[in-house]
Curated annotation (Swiss-Prot):
PROSITE patterns to which the protein is assigned, alphabetical: ILVD_EDD_1, ILVD_EDD_2
Keyword Iron-sulfur: yes
Needed cofactors: [2Fe-2S] cluster; Mg(2+)
Organism listed in the record: Francisella philomiragia subsp. philomiragia (strain ATCC 25017 / CCUG 19701 / FSC 153 / O#319-036)
InterPro entries according to UniProt: DHAD_IlvD/Edd, Dihydro-acid_dehy_C, DihydroxyA_deHydtase, DiOHA_6PGluconate_deHydtase_CS, ILV_EDD_C, ILV_EDD_N, IlvD/EDD_N
Keyword Lyase among record annotations: yes
Any matching Pfam family: ILV_EDD_C
UniProt protein name: Dihydroxy-acid dehydratase
Pathway: Amino-acid biosynthesis; L-isoleucine biosynthesis; L-isoleucine from 2-oxobutanoate: step 3/4; Amino-acid biosynthesis; L-valine biosynthesis; L-valine from pyruvate: step 3/4
Post-translational modification N6-carboxylysine, affected residues: 127
Amino acid sequence: MTKVLNKYSRRLTEDKSQGASQAMLYGTGMNDNDMHKPQIGIASVWYEGNTCNMHLNQLAQFVKNSVEKENLKGMRFNTIGVSDGISMGTDGMSYSLQSRDLIADSIETVMSAHWYDGLVSIPGCDKNMPGCMMALGRLNRPGFVIYGGTIQAGVMRGKPIDIVTAFQSYGACLSGQISEQERQETIKKACPGAGACGGMYTANTMACAIEALGMSLPFSSSTPATSVEKVQECDKAGETIKNLLELDIKPRDIMTRKAFENAMVLITVMGGSTNAVLHLLAMASSVDVDLNIDDFQEIANKTPVLADFKPSGKYVMADLHAIGGTPAVMKMLLKAGMLHGDCLTVTGKTLAENLESVADLPEDNTIIHKLDNPIKKTGHLQILKGNVAPEGSVAKITGKEGEVFEGVANVFDSEEEMVAAVEEGKVKKGDVIVIRYEGPKGGPGMPEMLKPTSLIMGAGLGQDVALITDGRFSGGSHGFIVGHIAPEAYEGGMLALLENGDKITIDAINNVINVDLSDQEIAQRKAKWQAPKQKATRGTLKKYIKTVSSASTGCVTDLD
């Protein structure tokens, strides 16, 4: 008996009572034969205004061509996206994190309303990645992700530069390290074309996580956007989705607890973004996998940082592609017993089977350190708790900035206030910069603090100050930084009670973040505190404030 592959779409295409549905489909150009084909949603996060996304419609066409070669019907549709790089440092960043959930909602909506049988998602930028994955998890129909790919490095005066060079150029100009002419040259040459920001920033971090989860094809995360190999990956989409339909392999068969452990190990080895904590928690929630913030610390305790990627290192993802790509790194980790090789993937094979034919990393490569010579012996993503963050916080500690910082609070109620203080020379060595009311509800949208961290680094203060916030950090942020502090200030968390001059200790060895105040002093301040007004009174951000959960649970919007 032939297996039914159009088990969803046939509800519309083969039911005589759905004549209007069929009339509209005939109107799109479908014929009698098409009406019996499985329909595959092709969700492209395309828009022109961002290097990460500008080429995705072209990739979607390649995917559609591949799908239709397999006697399937490809149905392209679009969803929204927000460029973190463009909105960074402005109120527009409030829309970034919530775009993740809007992407998931919109893909779920189109797929469910139109009864598509499978899904190929094509994300390009930071929040695109988990948004597409959350939709796949909720729907639990055969599907996978094709990453839009990484950008090539820019070149200025013979040296490689990237988006973070552009971010840091303003601080460097303020401090006299570069001229205005050099700053202008930097911003014009940092992004040479299509592709996501090139270092181990959030998009590449999440692409690695998705590949380790088994939800993208091998090499997807490290293949550059404009390469022949990215087109070849799209050409495999048809046979891949048809195989998933025939074997009835669904996301929840792949996105298991062990698969999430693989993802956490890989992003740690790669020196990935703090945003991975939020996004993996949200992705796990979409498939009902029990994952919590403390699981990241368990992985960090036994997993080294091996990759020398920007922002704290010197290489970009295209460099890894040239020496074997992400699968070569995973093969090394599998040999060392650090990955679960028996996890199922979208190829229909296990992770170990996918890696059998992959070449080893070159012995003399300088991008990925050997296990006996790590950049940092334990993970860089550290979960800190204490009276400043009872529910937890996420620190990005590579080791280059030290592991303990003691200083005095310099408190700001917004990112803009802090930026002005740096410009006016009011941030000094020994400060623990506190940026509060920038959490999921308070921000709203938990905006990223790349502009402040870039100013700090550009001004030469990276080794001398720390920054803590209930907001997030870009994958491009580095320095002594702690974000995701929960509870957030807007909900009366400890950040709301801090005052200038308070002594704060950040200890990434013992995973503690504390302020030197007695319980009585904290209670007295709490009694005087008044909640601020919501920053959004209408529209999508108003709804986000009402529905978003704490950073410690992934900032999801569909919890009970």
